[in-house]
Amino acid sequence: MKSSGPVERLLRALGRRDSSRATSRPRKAEPHSFREKVFRKKTPVCAVCKVTIDGTGVSCRVCKVATHRKCEAKVTSSCQALPPAELRRSTAPVRRIEHLGSTKSLNHSKQRSTLPRSFSLDPLMERRWDLDLTYVTERILAAAFPARPDEQRHRGHLRELAHVLQSKHRDKYLLFNLSEKRHDLTRLNPKVQDFGWPELHAPPLDKLCSICKAMETWLSADPQHVVVLYCKGSKGKLGVIVSAYMHYSKISAGADQALATLTMRKFCEDKVATELQPSQRRYVSYFSGLLSGSIRMNSSPLFLHYVFVPVLPAFEPNTGFQPFLKIYQSMQLVYTSGVYRIAGPGPQQLCISLEPALLLKGDVMVTCYHKGGQGTDRTLVFRVQFHTCTIHGSRLTFPKDQLDEAWADERFPFQASVEFVFSSSPEKVKGNTPRNDPSVSVDYNTTEPAVRWDSYENFNQHHEDSVDGALAHTRGPLDGSPYAQVQRVPRQTPPAPSPELPPPPMLSVSSDSGHSSTLTTEHTAESPGRPPPTAAERQELDRLLGGCGVASAGRGAGRETAILDDEEQPSVGGGLHLGMYSGHRPGLSRRCSCRQGFREPCGVPNGSYYRPEGTLERRRPPYGGYEGHPQGYAEASVEKRRLCRSLSEGPYPYAPELGKPANGDFGYRPAGYREVVILEDPGVPALCSCPACEEKLALPTAALYGLRLEREAAEGWSSEVGKPLLHPVRPGHPLPLLVPACGHHHAPMPDYGCLKPPKVGEEGHEGCSYAVCSEGRYGHSGYPALVTYGYGGAVPSYCPAYGRAPHSCGSPSEGRGYPSPGAHSPRAGSVSPGSPPYLQPRKLGYEISAEDGRDKYPLSGHLASTGPLASTESPEPSWRDGSSGHSTLPRSPRDPQCSASSELSGPSTPLHTSSPVQGKESNRRQDTTRSPSLAPTQRLSPGEALPSVVQGVAEKTPELLTSSRPEQLDPSPFSQTSAPGSPNGWPQERSPGGHTNSASPRSPVPTTLPGLRHAPWQGPRGTSDSPDGSPLTPVPTQMPWLVGSPEPPQSSPTPAFPLATSYDANGPIQPPLPEKRHLPGSGQQPSPPARSTNQHVTFASPLPDVTQPPEHPLQENQSNVKFVQDTSKFWYKPHLSRDQAIALLKDKDPGAFLIRDSHSFQGAYGLALKVATPPPSAQPWKGDPSEQLVRHFLIETGPKGVKIKGCPTEPYFGSLSALVSQHSISPISLPCCLRIPSKDPLEETPEAPVPTNMSTAADLLRQGAACSVLYLTSVETESLTGPQAVAKASSAALSCSPVPVPAIVHFKVSAQGITLTDNQRKLFFRRHYPVNSITFSSTDPQDRRWTNPDGATSKIFGFVAKKPGSPWENVCHLFAELDPDQPASAIVTFITKVLLGQRK
């Protein structure tokens, strides 16, 4: 082959006049000739320790290698003279190299050059390359593409690559895609497995193990099989996989494998060593350590308390250093800190305190960003990934060379490090509390886009080369830019190449690892930028982006002070970058954090992936060497019975699709490690039906993989090859594949006496007469999908009412009739997108559920007809309700709490922020046990003084309202104690408002499971116990279906399922809202500490915990009573939305007010006040003028108490009651004085008439319903529930071979649950699923049909129930319609509205 000019000159410079392989030899190595040198302009990286050389170092006169003086003796590489300067400085592209990438070039002997390895990665050959195909070994190929190739050319190269592979290996190759999914990869290649993860990141250990196992399975199946590793961008992914497989294969390697191991090591050193990130090296070391057995696993829980970050004043000289942290667990966002600002020079270290402590388990990634001066951009400071079970001390330190991005950043000092402080309990670390310098302030306005963006939520959710639709867009920023990237799909002309050059190519040479080839192309002219989008295009973008992309007139301009952002950011005119939160669309119900907006419920994509934040981040040329350790492996077993599993399993961090199995034994099972120790109920948080949000609602699960080692049995691992240990992780047990840290060290706790208390940043608004709580009717979408509880404004909930007499809602700390966090059944009561549209959101009224879950107070009709839906408020985050130990076990069937009735998908980006309340957080993160002694012993009248412990929240010290702990009932006293007015001897639970809640003596949920809250059934009452003495409608106490035998009363034949029945006989009601946390009251005793949630938010409590011993329920607390008459139950409505507050107050007199929980700032409150005239700055109002007179103010919480934010004249108050009392005397900064109400404003709203032909849910459930259906199959969904579980089961049933044979079964729904009877006894005789085990029911979200033998199709539906014997795993039972008169929608509606709704 005739060489081109530059190549020929390069060969001549290296002393190889003849390019023949037989005669070519590198010149003799010479020793280095070092001399001292001061590096001023450009500081190089030390060739030994890979750390930037600051100041003086040594440099070789010949080869120019630089190192520290102390590292001079450690230099191992030989001295090689550099090529001619013209080649070192040449950046012109080589025009062509004939037949590169073709079969001929791969087999040509001259193509395998023997360049020394020291030149194989030299950046001197900076030419544009399109494909680097290397034979790592004879059976492992590596195909690398640049990060941003021209799409049209890239497709051509993929076709050429497929042709080369097909011609040389036929169908004997398996392609592993390590980047984003692509349609053309699947079309062009016979077998493709998708194992993608973000660029420059380390893959989780389970994915690493899965890839190695899949490679071994494929290569061992046939001697002619080969593996092709495909990636785009950085070749670090190739290095990670090749290194991991090198360690993996050495376990069973013989003498014949030694050469393959050597060539893999050479490949890593030659081709990818300098592109490996520190976290990638660390995970390779984890993997090798796990394989070698040199790991000492840490099985204790790990709570993160503090993170110490170095202060980098030179990071951005103009704005200073403004860091904030994001913490991910299994690539799911679990914590976002506030933005720290350093006023002046002085502090060298910043302490970021997490209160309460954050429980971490498994793969953890911590990213530190710097918030730009504009407030709309952010820059990555460092990123570090580690695994928790490798941590064995209280302190974990990462020096600069172990931090991604920072290791090559000159602004990051060499001596700086990042430090994490852990403990084994959520209690505060004993000793000196670290404090920040007084010059450090914190901004907790984490709703800003630059802080809230999560760059990983949408990775691989769509194919990279997807061409469906006229527009392709990324749903969210990738690199911290404030705008989503929206691009036209090229139609006729090829797209312009990316203006940013790809990374420097590697010389495609491998001296001892086989063939190599590189495709090179000439630089093409850059095409001019596209014109700005037209109006039609903007309208289309607005539809695609859910109202997040087009600026419109927002109503935020009329507010008095910009206390809350209301998600209004200036949009960028022109171009395709559209402002994310630039305005509001009138028709939008809320914004979803996935930035997708409205989308047809066309199904859930297979797989939930995250988008790499590093895709568009600046990248520096990496330095450093490859470190590998010869150690053992952990295998990700493949199981036949799980090949049919769908991949729409919620937030599996990297669950790839199944691909095409090569044979019956090969297929990729989704990654087995899932975080299951902290199980949360997904609930139905918000009105968003986009697939990304729906997938986020599912809970992860865990699986243990067996190790193929001789010592496995002794270590508790399965020694049977290929058989996975699929055990759910139990509390207190270590997660699988937990391996020790590499490159970081542990040290004892430091002395933090030198640190100083933090200064809480405040946003002061001078000269304001109004401090508006501008949360907006739209709210924001940064709330955790896994833990929030749904409440939709106009979407009603269904909660059977036993009595309808109006009654007061009680004080703020009472137990309301809302879903209890611990026993909340995931997605219970919700209707999948495939269900009939029962709801007309804008035509429905509202009503507020009282504390017993029975008495409803419908709001005025304006609530549903004016303005955006009230449900646009973001859901109440459950960290207010119980942030630890939540279980996915179903709620008790006797818990008449409400559940939302429509498919409300939660946000796909769970934002877990720290609130402004920092400091004196109550540290007893414990479960509380309700004692039955309080209610039976004393009844309090409305005007009677309450115990201080119970009334502590009625006094409204807001910091105490942090999170309600999961509670467990002690069943033993219930059988012996009977409270006055409690029928059937059921005990009664005292609530602060003077009410008594009857609790069921029989809890069907086990009380021994940690973190499980037993929500008591609010039993019937025949006496009045409302504050105003109004009688409650009595309910018959004869309810054999609730207290009798498991079988329902056999009074009459079971009717069919009603087709058009309204299951709520008591008028429209408000959707369910979670409880506020209150302190363990009198008569309650703390149970062992529960685990923290996956989500995290910090609060503070200026008062100590008030946990009284159970022996003294009331006596010790009377002295602390401060209020003779508590009026907070009249004005504190924590669960009201903004629109509901407006509807209640717009017709009131000036001075009428309500206080509710802020839905934009956790821990804060919103004050809605009716004023006489609108403020002068208010803009013209197009709606009801009376609505403009309801103004909103933000009440912030802090260590000093509560105050109205935005006005410096406002003082702090110890409680909300004190604030209200003072402002009722003097308005201070408010427009007028507050008028304390004397009665509940909800009672003044007339009740909606009840049609006489409606059947109550209780009557329907008592009677039951049944019909015949086709039973298809049952599919294990692990911890997955909700519509994703039904979609997964449907996919499994429709894709399994052979197709399951359906059986006709009798399907009966009663108060006890669901009973299936196989009349023909083909599969079983009878199966019963108790109501407490059923968590969800819906039709197939993708509306797929079951094809019967006669060709007719039937709708598929199913219900999700707990797997017997396992508190964490679920099973989805799938059915198809049989009787046309009994459609699936009617069955699902009956289960959802009646069965699941009744038990709440």
From Swiss-Prot:
Task: List locations, semicolon-separated.
Answer: Cell junction, Focal adhesion; Cell membrane; Cytoplasm
Which superkingdom does the taxonomy of this entry point to?
Answer: Eukaryota
The molecular function GO annotations come to: identical protein binding; lipid binding; protein kinase binding; protein tyrosine phosphatase activity; signaling receptor binding; zinc ion binding
Question: Boundaries of each SH2 domain copy?
Answer: 1131-1238
SMART domains xref list: C1, PTB, PTEN_C2, SH2
Membrane association type: Peripheral membrane protein
Q: Where is the Phosphatase tensin-type domain?
A: 122-294
Q: Where is the composition biased (Pro residues)?
A: 492-506, 1046-1056
**UniProt tissue specificity:** In the adult kidney, expressed mainly in glomeruli (at protein level). In the newborn kidney, localizes on the basal surface of podocytes along the glomerular basement membrane and not in endothelial cells. Low expression levels in anabolic skeletal muscles.
Which sequence positions carry the modification called Phosphotyrosine? 456, 483
Record text on subunit structure and interactions: Interacts with AXL. Interacts with SYK; leading to its phosphorylation. Interacts with SQSTM1 (via PB1 domain); the interaction leads to sequestration of TNS2 in cytoplasmic aggregates with SQSTM1 and promotes TNS2 ubiquitination and proteasomal degradation.
Q: What is this protein called?
A: Tensin-2
Q: What is the species listed in this Swiss-Prot or TrEMBL entry?
A: Mus musculus (Mouse)
